Amino acid sequence: MADTTVDKLATEVGKSTDRLVEQFSQAGIKKSANDTVSESEKQQLLDFLKKQHGGDAAPTKMTLQRKSVSTLSVAGSGGQSKDVKVEVRKKRTFVKRDEAAEAELAAAAKAEEAKAAEVAKTAAEAKAKLDAEAKAKAKADAEAKAKAKVLTEKPVQESAEDKAAKAEEAKLLAAQDAAAKSKADEDVAAAAEVARRLAEENEKRWAEEEKARKEAEKTVDHHVTTSTEARAAEDTADANAEKRGRRPRKPSANAGNNANANAGAGKPGGKGKRGKDNRRDSRNSRNSRNNRSVAPESMDHAFTKPAAVVKADVSIGETVSVSELASKMSIKATEIIKQMMKMGSMVTINQVLDQETAQLVAEEMGHKVVLTRENELEHQVLADRNGDVLAESRAPVVTIMGHVDHGKTSLLDYIRRAKVASGEAGGITQHIGAYHVETENGMITFLDTPGHAAFTAMRARGAKATDIVILVVAADDGVMPQTIEAIQHAKAGGVPLIVAVNKMDKPEADPDRVKSELSQHGVMSEDWGGNNMFVNVSAKTGAGIDELLEGILLEAEVLELKAIKEGMAAGVVVESKLDKGRGPVATVLVQEGTLKQGDIVLCGLEYGKVRAMRDENGKAITEAGPSIPVEILGLSGVPSAGDEATVVRDERKAREVALYRQGKFRDVKLARQQKSKLENMFANMTEGEVEELNIVLKADVQGSLEAICDSLNALSTAEVKVNIIARGVGGLTETDATLAAASNAIMVGFNVRADAQARKVVESESVDLRYYSIIYQLIDEVRDAMSGLLAPEFKQEIIGLAEVRDVFKSPKIGAIAGCMVTEGTIKRSAPIRVLRDNIVIYEGELESLRRFKDDVSDVRNGMECGIGVKNYNDVRVGDQIEVFETVEIARTL
């Protein structure tokens, strides 16, 4: 390396030139800024700086100190606790190995190595000398043999004495050679043994010195020494405090234990325990001077590990999530998930379980289950009602259904005009939707056409507000689509049906035709051996009206309709609305008890105090009995048609129940089973059962309706069945939407549309509504939905075939097959098979696909490519690589 100047060296080390010149001067070297500096001068300056800054005196010992302060709560006199600050100081010293000792060990090792090398050298020299003597002897023997050969050729005859002398000489030479060789071998063996013993002694001595050094380092533990000395000082201080006490301490019952503890202090492992027991006893003795009732406290914890699984009583409500159930059972949620997987159910930690499933899981894991109801307050409020009150006969509630052109309204007008007091004027009060009439044989309550929709809603919620259905059919028109719809609603509600054949005054009336058409829909006349009563009436002349009313009362008598007349009322909401001037208005049909003004009413999600009551004529009333429709004001909101209205005692509890229902309303909707939509029909399939696809069908004309129904019914198989629960001609109405929501059905409109009220129900109830204008499209989509219930089939299709022409080795991938695509296309993402003599020897996937050193996604027929098979290197020339893909084939009907 070339010499550098002082100025350049100052720039390299980051110092000023004057400072560096001064340091050179202090080191005894006279330099200026432009003088050159040699390597020896640099080393001399560095040694001087090290000595000046203490570089030679490297630290041989390092001490670390740590201090921590904590607070300990200790019971004091008088049962009060006091806080004691505890300061813990830790000190640890690390000692560096002595460099002199290391140098001495290194020198000794070097000397031993030199000695062993000298011995080995001596042995090698002896062996070399022996080899030289052997070579010289061999040379002499060769010369002697040559000389003897020359002598033998001479014709002179040797004497017997010469031969004997030569033989003796040869014998002596052989003995000398053997002795010299054995001596050399002994010297070599002795030298090797000496070297081996020296090496073993050195290794043993070095191991002992290293072990002694490590033990010395372990003993120099100032932390242990400090803590031991601190405990000894504390014990001494406690003993001195006891000696300075006013009264001597009386011998206690545990004196023997203390003596044993002190006696065992000298044993190994008893040092720390002795100090701890002494300190605890001294604290107890100090406390005994202040308060004799203080018992010696134990610093050991009282927790014992349970020997078996803890069996607890698990309280389970109507619904509980997996995480909540795990918390109640004091286990991890994964244990519940494992248990449910064993039971055949795949759940997540946040999935909500119903009460029965949660009970089964908890009992399976060995816990006792206590079932609770979150709506206990609701049950208490509804149970706090009438006592043992005898039920009395009540008037029947009759709903009149039928086609709007079949004289239903005229029949209602005639019944009301004939049976209501003559002083009362006006027609039917349409806004209330219900009224009652008095006959000679009893009272009858009628629900008019708006009650039709309310009836469907009530059936959807499980209420039975209607007792009897009157089906009005025009004698000259026969059965119409809305008539069939009314029959379906009556059958779905499970109520008896009375047929009123109207317009008998017309000359073209044909009641037998009506009976024949109704019999095709399951409504059979009593004259034909059926169970349905047929009455011929005329709303224009009044013929047959009395027979109809008598038939209604007779059917009611057969049904034995009874209700409690006295006490707290209960009923059902027929219809409701929001009036601008009066607020929420609900029409309630009282089913039992007596509803009075001022009662607290709990109605579905709403509640309130009855501020006013009106009858069907709009007159204010103060009470209403069973089977009486009444209009009430004062609710907190508009209830839904079909909600149960119940009178309760406490308004505060009614408000709590209403708020609870409102909170649970969303949960109930989310927990409800998924509806039978076309997209998730397969998810709703249950094994071993015949699936049904419920459909509410509406079409524009009767011919299209019949054709669609026949085609859909023909699609039914042993596994999937089409169930058309309602059909008709005309637009989709609110009644159809409510029926579809109640039956988990699909609404299908063929060249028709839904009105505003129906769309509102569809949106609120999440009903699947579909429109079609081509009959084949409708049938195909329903067939696809039914096919979705069948398990799909999977088929493997070969998309490409490549022949291996050559095999190359790659350090990264392994064996690379140089192939020619003979059929189809080779794709990188598709699985492959390796064929040898048309036998599959490997099935896997491609690791690389290249063409001209470029990665490609596919290679077509007739092209060459390089293929790397993943995790397989036994590719040979002549093999075939087959590329295939799995295709899912949906089953069709």
From Swiss-Prot:
Region (Disordered): 135-169, 201-300
Domain of life: Bacteria
Gene3D superfamilies tied to this protein: P-loop containing nucleotide triphosphate hydrolases, Putative DNA-binding domain, N-terminal subdomain of bacterial translation initiation factor IF2, Translation factors, Translation initiation factor IF- 2, domain 3
GO molecular function, one term: GTPase activity
UniProt region (G3), positions on chain: 448-451
Region called G5, residue ranges: 538-540
Binding site for GTP: 402-409, 448-452, 502-505
SUPFAM superfamilies, alphabetized: Initiation factor IF2/eIF5b, domain 3 (SSF52156), P-loop containing nucleoside triphosphate hydrolases (SSF52540), Putative DNA-binding domain (SSF46955), Translation proteins (SSF50447)
Major localization listed first in the record, in broad terms: cytoplasm
Cellular localisation: Cytoplasm
Residue span of region G4: 502-505
Keywords: Cytoplasm, GTP-binding, Initiation factor, Nucleotide-binding, Protein biosynthesis
UniProt domain tr-type G: residue ranges: 393-562
Feature: compositional bias, Basic and acidic residues: 201-224
Keyword Cytoplasm among record annotations: yes
One GO cellular component term: cytosol
Regions of compositional bias (Low complexity) in chain numbering: 251-265
Chain intervals for the UniProt region annotation (G1): 402-409
InterPro entries per the UniProt record, alphabetical: DNA-bd_dom_put_sf, EF-G-like_DII, EFTu-like_2, IF2_assoc_dom_bac, IF2_II, IF2_N, P-loop_NTPase, Small_GTP-bd
Region entry G2, spans: 427-431
Membrane-spanning intervals of the chain: none
Family from the record: Belongs to the TRAFAC class translation factor GTPase superfamily. Classic translation factor GTPase family. IF-2 subfamily.
Function: One of the essential components for the initiation of protein synthesis. Protects formylmethionyl-tRNA from spontaneous hydrolysis and promotes its binding to the 30S ribosomal subunits. Also involved in the hydrolysis of GTP during the formation of the 70S ribosomal complex.
Name listed for the protein in its UniProt record: Translation initiation factor IF-2
Lineage: Bacteria, Pseudomonadati, Pseudomonadota, Gammaproteobacteria, Alteromonadales
Gene: infB
